[in-house]
Amino acid sequence: MAIKVGINGFGRIGRIVLRNALKNPEVEVVAVNDPFIDTEYAAYMFKYDSTHGRFKGKVEAKDGGLIIDGKHIQVFGERDPSNIPWGKAGADYVVESTGVFTGKEAASAHLKGGAKKVIISAPSGDAPMFVVGVNLDAYKPDMTVISNASCTTNCLAPLAKVVNDKYGIIEGLMTTVHSITATQKTVDGPSHKDWRGGRTASGNIIPSSTGAAKAVGKVIPELNGKLTGMSLRVPTVDVSVVDLTVRIKNGASYEDIKATMKAASESPELKGILGYTDEDVVSTDFIGDTHSSIFDAKAGIGLNDNFVKLISWYDNEYGYSARVVDLIVAVAKKDASA
């Protein structure tokens, strides 16, 4: 029996979560809610994607919903999450992907409509955060609202976990060179909280803040207070890259670290989550890659055996959305056996 899922917010992540879910027989998306997109437009936006290409299957708007490859998905247009009839639609697990309801209390509104569990596809200030392959052991079935953390945390955490488990991280700094996202501006415009963030996205490298490195301390408590970082927003439409520079306790050559990362990428715990490449790749080579993090063996460097720079790629849309689906499957299995 497939896990019944609803998606609130049919933006970049909502639509790509649906693309990933359609490939997974363990999951069935039964409903989508978005107050700003009518059904015809939802079908168009799902079918055509400037970054990930045209959807290969059949998409049509019919009977107040979407029919994708013969499967009917109800479409709602409620602004208030508590009014979305998830229960009537049969959706037990709801992906909260509006980017608005990221707090535990706000996301809990979905439970009033009949949802049993809410997965926030963004970092949360107070909901428990989970990174697949890193801290799923901490999940408890009585948790009703959880977060899949951020795309950058999903890239950084597996990398940091492998390094810390083998060598011990003393401290580190992270920079993510991050593609454009929907919150940025096409031309200079007002952005009162972040003045630099109001500048033209397509023509600037924009320094920005990110909580991704600090969030790793929440999913790997041993690293709490040992990592922080920043972001550089760059004019590419998709795919980002983490630069993690760390001091390690147990000295190792860069060659040894590469071997450790390769072995980890093939391990049962991280296969499909942590990737490994030793080829001369660039960012567009990773569009559509479903790994959370792809270690670039040729791009990193070591100053000495205790001070290294590690580079890891991620499709901040597709890879992250794949993990949202994986998280749903993982928690549903734990819920079923509780």
Curated annotation (Swiss-Prot):
Q: Which GO terms describe its biological process?
A: glucose metabolic process; glycolytic process
Enumerate the residues binding D-glyceraldehyde 3-phosphate: 150-152, 181, 210-211, 233
The protein's annotated pathway: Carbohydrate degradation; glycolysis; pyruvate from D-glyceraldehyde 3-phosphate: step 1/5
Task: Offer an example of a GO molecular function term for this protein.
Answer: glyceraldehyde-3-phosphate dehydrogenase (NAD+) (phosphorylating) activity
Q: What does the subunit section of this Swiss-Prot or TrEMBL entry state?
A: Homotetramer.
Concerning NCBIfam families, the annotation shows: GAPDH-I (TIGR01534)
What this protein is called in its record is Glyceraldehyde-3-phosphate dehydrogenase
Q: Which organism is it from?
A: Yarrowia lipolytica (strain CLIB 122 / E 150)
Gene name, per UniProt, is GPD
